[in-house]
Amino acid sequence: PHAPFNAPKKYWDLYDRASLPPLNPARPSGAPDLAFHDSRELLGLPPDRVEFTAEQVAEIRHGYFANISYLDAQLGKLLDALKRSGRLDNTIILFVGDHGYHLGEHQLWAKNSNFELDARVPLLIAPPECRQAGGRTASLVELIDLFPTLVDLCALPEPPGLEGVSLVPVLGDTAQSVKTAAFTQAPRPAYFDREPGGQPTAMGVSVRTAELRSTQWRDWASGQVLARELYDHQQQPEELVNRIDDPQWARARMQAETLLEAQFPRPSLGAK
């Protein structure tokens, strides 16, 4: 959900504000400035920019949880209506978010980063007679996989040129994985379309594997890499330390950056 977090009171009452999961607002150690943005979606811009008090942060986070429960209730109404219509057993249900959200973590608010909290989204797929009902999977997924999945579930011919892959194998066996990497991008400035010139100055391209997240920040005009990030998702999924200069991660970094170069080719500059 987006701000304003204005769910009805009964959804706020589901949560004890003091018992919500703790917030770690620290920036990841060693992360470049390009990894961050001005959080204007919630904080605004000068001269009207604000800084939240601790009480306001707690209220906003409480409101986010309330909005999620409100959203869940609306989804329940939709499913009840499908059941009453007699169409539930002939309907593919797919619930997805278009981006994640920061609530003060990493000193960020709202979206527009390549961190996991923005890149990871909820995804529920419930075809009729799903054999893995209620199952969860660690399989990497991209939103470009949704259309091929629906085509597959409907037994339709797959159009040529699709970038995504069907997730049907995962629906049959949640231990399966259909891809080894998922990619995201985030521009800088985050709202470049509202800046003079209407173009970004840099683009962050990121790859997530089962083990790590690797991000390159590239000059928009030349493609030259301006900054790099590498986060260990096995031991620290919160992305709190940039491991880019850690020699123990040198091989993994090289492999991840090979994936990035293949997915997001750069001009031949000679510069790395």
Describe each PLM feature range.
Residues 2, 15, 52, 121-124, ...:
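A short aromatic-rich beta-strand->coil structural motif
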Residues 4-52:
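Core domains of carbohydrate- and sulfate-ester-processing enzymes
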Residues 4-10, 14, 81-142, 191-192, ...:
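Histidine-centered active-site microenvironments of extracellular/periplasmic hydrolases
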Residues 32-33, 58-70, 87, 113-121, ...:
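A short beta-strand-to-alpha-helix junction
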Residues 41-59, 67, 71, 190, ...:
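Long, internal low-complexity/basic segments
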Residues 56-60, 106, 127-134, 237, ...:
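Flexible glycine/proline-enriched surface loops and loop-helix/loop-strand junctions
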Residues 64-71, 75-78, 92-97, 123-125, ...:
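Beta-strand elements within well-structured catalytic alpha/beta cores of enzymes
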Residues 99-105, 131, 144-147, 152-233, ...:
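C-terminal cap/loop subdomain of S1 sulfatases and analogous C-terminal strand-loop tails that border
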